[in-house]
Regions:
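Active-site acidic/histidine proton-transfer and metal-coordination neighborhood
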Residues: 15, 19, 56-63, 76-178, ...
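Active-site-proximal loop/turn and secondary-structure-junction residues that shape catalytic pockets
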Residues: 13-15, 36-38, 71-73, 109-113, ...
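Histidine-acidic metal/acid-base catalytic patches
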Residues: 1-6, 14, 18-26, 87, ...
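Glycine-rich, proline-tolerant flexible connector loops at the mouths of alpha/beta enzymes
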Residues: 33-55, 115
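Catalytic-core regions built around general acid/base machinery
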Residues: 48-62, 129-133, 196, 232-236
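Conserved beta-strand positions in the central sheet of alpha/beta enzyme cores
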Residues: 33, 66, 106, 142, ...
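N-terminal small/glycine-rich loop or linker at the start of catalytic domains
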Residues: 1-6, 66-77
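Short, flexible/disordered intra-domain loops and linkers
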Residues: 41-45, 151-159, 222
Length: 275
């Protein structure tokens, strides 16, 4: 599979999965993911009939489907009732992934309000339970490194620094859990994209998520509008032996499709074999 075919588009909650598959098939996009929290893709709407039809449509178009949980759901919950709800939420996503034959589910490390250590411990517990269940049913989870928030913000995402990401991956070792590398998030912290590549186990890399930014704030810009060196990024990641997919996550669907050519061009200029 050539590099362009390995670059997909994040449907998010923009369209139904059925519409998203049709859109991707028309444009030759081979990788898509979607969030299933609200209409038109609410988790509870995926009965056997709907899952069968989606599986058939994706298979016929040779489209690889993934799911993406909502980062606003705090996976680092430790409060009674809410903690149990987190486990149920992740299990429900995994169950739908199995029914859809979705190849991955992106999960998040949670967020904290100043109680970082307690939240990280709770998050590892929830993700450990989810990855054990995924292992049992044949699903794969991708844990995403998150974005920095301004220092005076009340809420802060976890695993936005290399050190925090290492905390998670050192404790979550089942094969069913891999890494979703969001490069624009890494670009917001001193570690940078290179720091994450050097500091985490690249053999666990499941996907690379792409948007541009200026390194100042969490803004998902189209590649070329910020200052990320995408040529260098591709050079480093491809040199690691990574053969998986990249996922565009910015703008609208057409922006993400159009940017695939720009990204391939940046890779080729950097000496990457895009064939």
């Amino acid at each position: 599979m050539n590099l362009k075919d390995r670059i997909g588009a994040d449907l998010g909650r923009r369209v139904s999965l059925e519409e998203g598959i049709a859109w991707a098939a028309e444009r030759g996009v081979k990788f898509i993911d979607a969030q299933l929290d609200i209409t038109p893709n609410g988790l509870t709407t995926f009965d056997a009939a709907r899952c069968d039809a989606i599986r058939e449509a994706a298979g016929a178009a040779d489209i690889h489907l993934g799911l993406h949980t909502l980062s606003g759901v705090n996976i680092a919950e430790y409060s009674p009732f809410l903690s149990e709800a987190v486990d149920d939420y992740l299990k429900a996503y995994i169950d739908v992934a199995v029914r859809l034959k979705a190849e991955w589910v992106v999960v998040h490390p949670g967020h904290h309000f100043g109680d970082k250590e307690e939240r990280m411990e709770a998050a590892v517990g929830h993700i450990s339970k989810a990855s054990a269940y995924a292992e049992e049913v044949g699903a794969t989870l991708f844990l995403e490194n998150m974005n920095w928030e301004p220092d005076l913000a009340e809420v802060h995402y976890l695993a936005h620094t290399l050190e925090e990401a290492q905390y998670y991956f050192e404790r979550l070792t089942l094969p069913s859990l891999k890494w979703s590398f969001t490069v624009n998030h890494a670009h917001l912290v001193p570690d940078g994209i290179d720091g994450f590549i050097d500091g985490l186990d690249m053999s666990r890399l499941g996907e690379v998520r792409i948007a541009d930014c200026t390194g100042e704030y969490e803004i998902h810009m189209k590649p070329g509008e910020g200052n990320i060196d995408f040529g260098h990024m591709f050079e480093r990641i491809e040199a690691s032996g990574f053969k998986g997919h990249y996922m565009n996550a910015f703008g609208n669907l057409e922006d993400m499709n159009d940017a695939r050519d720009y990204l391939v061009e940046r890779a080729v200029v950097a000496g990457v074999d895009a064939r």
